[in-house]
């Protein structure tokens, strides 16, 4: 089991904080579900997977390494991150980018306009890309749009979370 916790929130008022908590609850339910695990294990072609098998990818997403540590099933893994909402610069007003993570840090940023326009399920999907794919799993992807980026672990995970969020409630635990 994996749990997600924001260590430091910046520019997040009570209303946005409630939506963030709701999105993280959705994300945890999805990532810890049998449905999510099956989707990860059954996916046919990840790119930028560092040569790992689907089972190793799943273990890295959930446990932080390709092989679960001894006794891992008894203790949930906690993934901490700092989360900040930032204003979108005027020259990026037409960009579809919702947010980003600075590599090798726990810092995740989301544009305010993107945050405000997302439902809790959409926010869970966005956070899944940043938190599960990048931070928890430590996977990367090409910076330019294209089939290789779309098939990378963070983007595929984002799609799985978005798909499963539409099917909530997921009442089965993995």
Residue ranges and their predicted role:
Residues 130:
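Walker B catalytic acidic pair
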Residues 1-124, 134-174:
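Predominantly extracellular/secreted Zn2+-dependent metalloproteases
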């Amino acid at each position: 089991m994996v749990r997600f916790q924001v260590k430091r929130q910046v520019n997040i008022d009570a209303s946005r904080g409630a939506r963030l908590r709701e999105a993280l609850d959705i994300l945890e339910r999805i990532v810890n579900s049998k449905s999510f695990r099956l989707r990860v294990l059954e996916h046919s072609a990840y790119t930028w997977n560092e040569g790992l098998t689907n089972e190793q990818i799943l273990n890295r997403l959930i446990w932080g390494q390709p092989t679960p540590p001894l006794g891992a099933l008894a203790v949930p893994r906690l993934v901490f991150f700092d989360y900040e909402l930032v204003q979108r610069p005027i020259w990026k007003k037409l960009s579809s980018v919702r947010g980003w993570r600075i590599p090798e840090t726990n810092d995740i940023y989301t544009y305010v306009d993107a945050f405000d326009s997302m439902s809790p399920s959409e926010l869970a999907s966005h956070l899944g890309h940043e938190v599960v794919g990048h931070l928890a799993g430590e996977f990367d992807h090409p910076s330019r749009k294209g089939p290789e980026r779309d098939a990378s672990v963070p983007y595929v995970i984002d799609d799985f979370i978005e798909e499963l969020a539409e099917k909530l409630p997921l009442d089965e635990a993995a």
